[in-house]
């Protein structure tokens, strides 16, 4: 493939953007090489500035569950912009969005719109601290909840990709308020609550870890956390920025049947636009200003164009059978990848929950951050580049989940598997 224009753009970008990108994982530092620059996207495909086409399993890191540039979403945006781009005042679309979310996610009796998943998690933790009068939070190794200071402790996503467990610039006094647990560690959770339970405002967790690749919870683990939080008076926060409306229409909490006190959302609810939200029990949400004393605000929150895009996307995912078909397509892909690896004599396993999946270069089951980081990263990096050269774009890090869309039909998946058979053969050489 020719990447001359992408190469030139990356060189230019590095003179004006730190590392040449606006989010670290995009720079390909984990896998090596240079990123391609996207010119446009449609359906299951990305097209770069050099005219190359890629089957895309990143999906803008999750929002593109119905494929890129879906006509219904695009047309909704086009209609909305005729009336203005931003009002800084209430509009009907944000009410409809809140009603849609509360209708699909019963644990959310009220919702506050924000502009990103990071804003949502920061705001949810502030609410938890204000509501409980406590300061400490518990998170999990490898889980990523945005770039808020409290969360950059043993974090996943770009932090894990770059091998940085904490970030310079985070005050020690603040990071000391964040306790960490191993994901799927029942005994560790019980012991930590026995030690610091009266100080804990909230437990925040990705119910399916998507930022240390894709790691589902063991049976009963989320309910175990629910029980501990209730017993000790702490709030349980599900970060459903990735899983919300993807692993099931009602998110991971519907899929696993566990009810959190607060939930955070993003990605799909923006349809590709910058949107986040947090919601939960009415008695908690009514403590947010102006209804209550806990302050949170945003100039662009509830932006009418973003609301239009998100509402159109949420309408698409409510079509009968949408999530069943998405899960079946993801299963077909995962089974095909394992078969292709096995034929090449390469140790590979996969994890999948609905339309999320993870590919691990190991024979072992992966159920924790430690197991994810023990996989063969060198082989993953070789596989990534072999697939990219064959026109298939996977997440440029061994520590990021993959995402299926409804635009990935049987033909696209078979083309992916054909590329994988050749790519695994390359890795085996």
From Swiss-Prot:
Task: Tell me which UniProt keywords the record has, alphabetically.
Answer: Cytoplasm, Isomerase, Porphyrin biosynthesis, Pyridoxal phosphate
N-terminal signal peptide: none
Pfam families noted in UniProt: Aminotran_3 (PF00202)
Cite the EC number: 5.4.3.8
Using the UniProt record, give the first listed, main subcellular location. cytoplasm
Q: Which SUPFAM superfamilies match?
A: PLP-dependent transferases
Task: Note the superkingdom of the native organism.
Answer: Bacteria
**What are the GO BP annotations of this UniProt entry?**
protoporphyrinogen IX biosynthetic process
GO MF entries: glutamate-1-semialdehyde 2,1-aminomutase activity; pyridoxal phosphate binding; transaminase activity
Task: Name the chemical reaction catalysed here.
Answer: (S)-4-amino-5-oxopentanoate = 5-aminolevulinate
Q: Where is it localised?
A: Cytoplasm
Q: Which residues carry this modification: N6-(pyridoxal phosphate)lysine?
A: 267
Q: Does the keyword Isomerase apply?
A: yes
Keyword Isomerase among UniProt keywords: yes
Its annotated pathway? Porphyrin-containing compound metabolism; protoporphyrin-IX biosynthesis; 5-aminolevulinate from L-glutamyl-tRNA(Glu): step 2/2
InterPro entries, alphabetized: 4pyrrol_synth_GluAld_NH2Trfase (IPR004639), Aminotrans_3 (IPR005814), Aminotrans_3_PPA_site (IPR049704), PyrdxlP-dep_Trfase (IPR015424), PyrdxlP-dep_Trfase_major (IPR015421), PyrdxlP-dep_Trfase_small (IPR015422)
Cofactor list: pyridoxal 5'-phosphate
For this UniProt entry, what's an example GO CC term? cytoplasm
* Subunit relationships: Homodimer.
Record's family? Belongs to the class-III pyridoxal-phosphate-dependent aminotransferase family. HemL subfamily.
How is this protein named in the record? Glutamate-1-semialdehyde 2,1-aminomutase
What species is this protein from?
Xanthomonas oryzae pv. oryzae (strain PXO99A)
The gene coding this protein: hemL
């Amino acid at each position: 493939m020719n990447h001359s224009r992408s190469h030139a753009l990356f060189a230019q970008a590095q003179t004006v953007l730190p590392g040449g990108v606006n989010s670290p994982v995009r720079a390909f530092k984990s896998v090596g090489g240079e990123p391609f620059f996207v010119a446009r996207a449609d359906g299951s495909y990305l097209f770069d500035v050099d005219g190359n086409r890629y089957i895309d399993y990143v999906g803008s890191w999750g929002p593109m569950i119905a494929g890129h540039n879906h006509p219904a979403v695009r047309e909704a945006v086009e209609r909305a912009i005729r009336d203005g781009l931003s009002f800084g005042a209430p509009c009907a679309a944000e009410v409809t969005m809140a009603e849609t979310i509360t209708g699909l996610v019963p644990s959310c009796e009220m919702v506050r719109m924000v502009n990103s998943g990071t804003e949502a998690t920061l705001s949810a933790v502030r609410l938890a601290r204000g509501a409980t009068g406590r300061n400490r939070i518990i998170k999990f190794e490898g889980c990523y909840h945005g770039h808020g200071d409290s969360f950059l402790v043993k974090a996943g996503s770009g932090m894990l990709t770059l091998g940085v467990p904490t970030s310079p610039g985070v005050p020690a006094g603040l990071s000391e308020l964040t306790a960490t647990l191993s994901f799927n560690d029942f005994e560790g959770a019980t012991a930590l609550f026995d030690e610091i339970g009266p100080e804990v405002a909230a437990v925040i967790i990705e119910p399916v870890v998507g930022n240390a690749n894709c790691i589902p919870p063991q049976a009963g683990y989320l309910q175990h956390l629910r029980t501990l939080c209730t017993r000790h008076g702490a709030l349980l926060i599900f970060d459903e920025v990735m899983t919300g409306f993807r692993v099931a229409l009602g998110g991971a909490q519907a899929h696993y049947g566990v009810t959190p006190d607060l939930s955070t959302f993003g990605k799909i609810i923006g349809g590709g636009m910058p949107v986040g939200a947090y919601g939960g029990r009415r008695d908690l949400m009514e403590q947010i200003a102006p209804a209550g004393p806990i302050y949170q605000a945003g100039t662009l929150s509830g932006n009418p164009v973003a609301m239009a895009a998100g509402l159109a996307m949420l309408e698409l995912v409510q079509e009968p059978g949408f999530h069943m078909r998405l899960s079946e397509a993801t299963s077909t892909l995962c089974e095909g990848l394992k078969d292709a690896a096995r034929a090449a004599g390469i140790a590979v396993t996969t994890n999948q929950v609905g339309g999320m999946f993870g590919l691990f270069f190991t024979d072992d089951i992966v159920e924790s951050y430690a197991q994810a980081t023990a996989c063969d990263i060198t082989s993953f990096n070789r596989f990534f580049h072999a697939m990219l050269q064959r026109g298939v774009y996977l997440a440029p890090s061994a520590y990021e989940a993959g995402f299926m869309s409804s635009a990935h039909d049987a033909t696209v998946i078979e083309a992916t598997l054909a590329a994988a058979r050749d790519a695994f053969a390359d890795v085996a050489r």
